[in-house]
Amino acid sequence: MSLFDHKITELKQMIHKKEIKISDLVDESYKRIASVDDKVQAFLQLDEERARAYAKELDEAVDGRSEHGLLFGMPIGVKDNIVTKGLRTTCSSKILENFDPIYDATVVERLQAAEAVTIGKLNMDEFAMGSSTENSAYKATKNPWNLDTVPGGSSGGSAAAVAAGEVPFSLGSDTGGSIRQPASFCGVVGLKPTYGRVSRYGLVAFASSLDQIGPITRTVEDNAFLLQAISGPDKMDSTSANVEVPDFLSSLTGDIKGLKIAVPKEYLGEGVGKEAKESVLAALKVLEDLGATWEEVSLPHSKYALATYYLLSSSEASANLARFDGIRYGYRSDNADNLIDLYKQTRSEGFGNEVKRRIMLGTFALSSGYYDAYYKKAQKVRTLIKKDFEDVFEKYDVIVGPTTPTPAFKIGEKTSDPLTMYANDILTIPVNLAGVPGISVPCGFADGLPLGLQIIGKHFDEGTVYRVAHAFEQATDHHKAKPEL
């Protein structure tokens, strides 16, 4: 049995009872990485020297002081688009190949304040653009359940590392499903918080109105621990919400009697696989047995979500990625004779194909002749999608459906057709457009690959999302399954 099979509360008790040292946890992480990461390919950089030194320092603090952080001694992996001082942050892109940040992201500072131990940086789709982690400039991460399949994306490294037992917890980011989809594919728990719940300061921007950092863990309880540690307003991020952070752990009561669940017919319609539908219906039966009720509803504008998302996110990306020009930091081409050529060559050589595709789409949507027809119209549809959610939440507590239409697909299966790749996010994208919280929890298997149940809540009501997710988790054994590597 791995130490990482224990929850945070159990590990902290073991530390304080002197049954284990924090150094043992860090050892376990690096030994497991050495054992399996050549297969899984989840990590890009390790911070072993600093992590071991910090673990030793924390070991001395067990008796040395009475107050300890919320994540005292817990090893964690961080997605490589979250800046870490003294540890390279590449966004899995050639253009940031040697970028060494001079400051920590707010979430990293909050992890440090909670006394977590950063193990290293995790692979991802380049600039978080992708659904399979095949778009990394460095390596393709594999799904620990079947090494021939993708782990999902863009936080594929974050989900795969937790599923493979390399770290017990990780941070990812979610712009259109990039935490929930890989969590579903890898059989772990992943939450996209309400937009504004967690500071984005130090998160390299893809689409600023959609991006949100969140936790990936083995259990719902651990997920709530991590969100507790990283949430809250931040003066460095004007989009962080000035709202009180509740005690998320107090929501994990197991009691969902009388709770009203909405199931959108669009989430079980055409394009959603038989196994995904069956697993959701089985999950709804579990929730019914626990005292909740459910009804079918409609989110009528969901059918426009995919097109709306790719217009808006690509438009924001084209603006955000304009800063990577070869002048201030990052890769600089040697094949240029003048400034204009330097910009062209640096960006052509430094960005991968998917990033360039989205920059071009965004630039087109924002161009003067097409702005009203594309970008402005997409913003109007986004408002309608948000209104759909608000209407449903007037009557219901949560929305439930599959996280993804199918389990993980084969590596290379969708890379030649971007539209089939994009369609994989069809059930997660509306949550980002509406800015509401959503979690994926394991709910079954298809052909030996995990499936995820998506639970969506009202703005800033992660507590109810956790309550339902935890009740379901405790009534089932799906989260206990582990891949064999």
Swiss-Prot record:
Any Pfam family: Amidase
GO biological process: translation
InterPro entries: Amidase (IPR000120), Amidase_CS (IPR020556), Amidase_dom (IPR023631), AS_sf (IPR036928), GatA (IPR004412)
GO molecular function: ATP binding; glutaminyl-tRNA synthase (glutamine-hydrolyzing) activity
Recorded GO CC terms: glutamyl-tRNA(Gln) amidotransferase complex
Domain of life where this protein originates: Bacteria
E.C. number: 6.3.5.7
Keyword Translocase found: no
Gene3D superfamilies named among the record's database cross-references: Amidase signature (AS) domain
Keyword line: ATP-binding, Ligase, Nucleotide-binding, Protein biosynthesis
Active site: 79, 154, 178
Matches recorded under HAMAP family: GatA
Biological function: Allows the formation of correctly charged Gln-tRNA(Gln) through the transamidation of misacylated Glu-tRNA(Gln) in organisms which lack glutaminyl-tRNA synthetase. The reaction takes place in the presence of glutamine and ATP through an activated gamma-phospho-Glu-tRNA(Gln).
Family of the protein in this entry: Belongs to the amidase family. GatA subfamily.
Subunit structure: Heterotrimer of A, B and C subunits.
Protein name: Glutamyl-tRNA(Gln) amidotransferase subunit A
Gene that this polypeptide is encoded by: gatA
